[in-house]
Amino acid sequence: MSSQLESEASFEATTLGFLRRQFTRPKPLPAGITLDGQVAIVTGSNVGLGLSVCKQLLQLGLSHLVMGVRSQAKGDVAADQLRKSFPSALISVWIVDMESYDSVCAFASHCESLDRIDIVILNAGLIKTPYTVAHATGNEVTLQVNYLSTALLTILLLPILKAKKAGGGSRPPVISIVGSDLMYQNEVELKGPVLPQFQQEETFSQFSWYGRSKLLQTLFVSKLAEFVDLNDVLVNVSNPGMTGGTDFFRGYPALVMKLIAVGQWILARPVNVAATTYLDAVLVQGEKSHGSFTSDWTIKPYPKLWYTPEGQELKERLWEETMEELNFVGASRIVNDLKS
């Protein structure tokens, strides 16, 4: 449905568009939603938005929660807190380090052991300063975590979800990749290779690169959806908006943190409110969200670049580069096999 919203794309890139999104009134979930018997996977789930959406899924009766975390110790602490509130639920803590392809592959392989998977929320992400390289891959970490490893995990999980889809008239499983409306304000060079642009340390800007990495996510998902039957698995991008009360900006200089805190005090959503956008993406929007960008409890347009011939060329070029980068797992074969 995002593909049909070109007329709204320019406005979303403006300051007024941002303000309208931030002050949109939250929409409650429809009555009667229950997740009894269902299994959900949430990455980046030991703090902030990830932990909040875990709690909300459990409040809806989720039977089995898999928390994908980088630190076993921190994950166990968060899981123990949840177990005290939801003693009847099974809560597992599995390691996934998004800076490592090997860790991502191991996590996906672990997911094959589950009897079913109904919901996947890929929430793990970062905004990093200074310029840092992921030692396991040699890629800049913003690109690695927010885009490449997230794309890899999505591709690896899709056939697993398709194979484990519940029978009968149940809704298809959903993968929602957490994006950002910062993509509306950031672009990449339209000519030449896309991924190498993130290896140019001299052009590094943490906020810009974060927004650009989220732009790549949305371009990728819009293309990926062409290979995935919406009756098998739904895949979308969900934007929580500016959110206060998280550790997202940890490690920044004190002055920067103070400025961010002021901005968040004025504009940001509470964590528990922002997390409901994830629930909306996986439980409410349904098939119209397939391949789309969800934000503020509705479907929003892609960035205006997407609707141009240049944007479509960029999408195709990014896709080819991504398939080449992930060729070590046979990404192209996996994606093409989804059609069968």
Predicted features and spans:
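Glycine-rich NAD(P)-binding loop of the Rossmann-fold in SDR/ketoreductase-type enzymes
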Residues: 141-149, 212-213, 269
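Hydrophobic positions on the long internal alpha-helix
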Residues: 104, 121, 149, 153-157, ...
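NAD(P)H-dependent oxidoreductase Rossmann-fold/reductase module
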Residues: 1-114, 118, 127, 186-340
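Amphipathic alpha-helical dimer-interface segment in Rossmann-like NAD(P)H-dependent oxidoreductases
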Residues: 145-169, 183-186, 225-226
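Short alpha-helical oligomerization interface
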Residues: 127-145
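Glycine-rich, N-terminal phosphate-binding loop of Rossmann-like dinucleotide-binding domains
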Residues: 44, 124, 146
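Conserved catalytic-site loops of classical short-chain dehydrogenases/reductases
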Residues: 118-119, 171-179, 236
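Redox-cofactor binding/interface segments in oxidoreductases and associated redox assembly factors
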Residues: 42, 122, 177
